[in-house]
């Protein structure tokens, strides 16, 4: 799922949001393709009402959750298993206010075909 576009209006109200709860994502993500992740928040800015909660992401060929220039999203109580590349990934390191709480990631594998960060996803 890709979430993109402008996320706030001039009145400071969020116009784009994504809410995933109790969803199973299986055999997702396109291997060896940057930007093709199961859940990808892409340059949305502030998204304080958005979340990924109590979901299962497994057998992913390209990461699990990816935040790119997106702020204030809650990632909570998710289980991620058998993932290639970074499981919970903040792409630029400028993302702020995102909450990662009570998540589990098991069997996260390296992927030399993505970014250097995906070679050692536990670092």
Regions found by a protein language model. Give the residues of each.
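Extracellular beta-strand-rich solenoid/capping regions of secreted or surface-exposed proteins
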Residues: 1-13, 41
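Beta-rich extracellular carbohydrate-active architectures
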Residues: 15, 20-30, 52, 56-58, ...
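A general structural-boundary detector
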Residues: 10, 62-65, 90
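Acidic/polar low-complexity surface segments
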Residues: 25-50, 86, 90-123
């Amino acid at each position: 799922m890709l979430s993109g576009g402008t996320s706030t209006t001039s009145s400071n109200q969020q116009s784009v949001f994504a809410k995933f709860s109790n969803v199973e994502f299986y055999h997702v993500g396109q291997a060896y393709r940057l930007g093709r992740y199961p859940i990808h928040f892409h340059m949305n800015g502030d998204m304080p009402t958005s979340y990924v909660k109590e979901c299962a992401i497994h057998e992913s060929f390209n990461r699990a959750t990816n935040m790119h220039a997106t702020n204030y999203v809650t990632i909570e109580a998710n289980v991620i298993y058998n993932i290639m590349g970074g499981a919970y990934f903040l792409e630029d390191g400028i993302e702020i206010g995102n909450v990662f709480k009570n998540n589990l990631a098991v069997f996260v594998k390296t992927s030399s075909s993505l970014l250097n960060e995906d070679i050692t996803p536990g670092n």
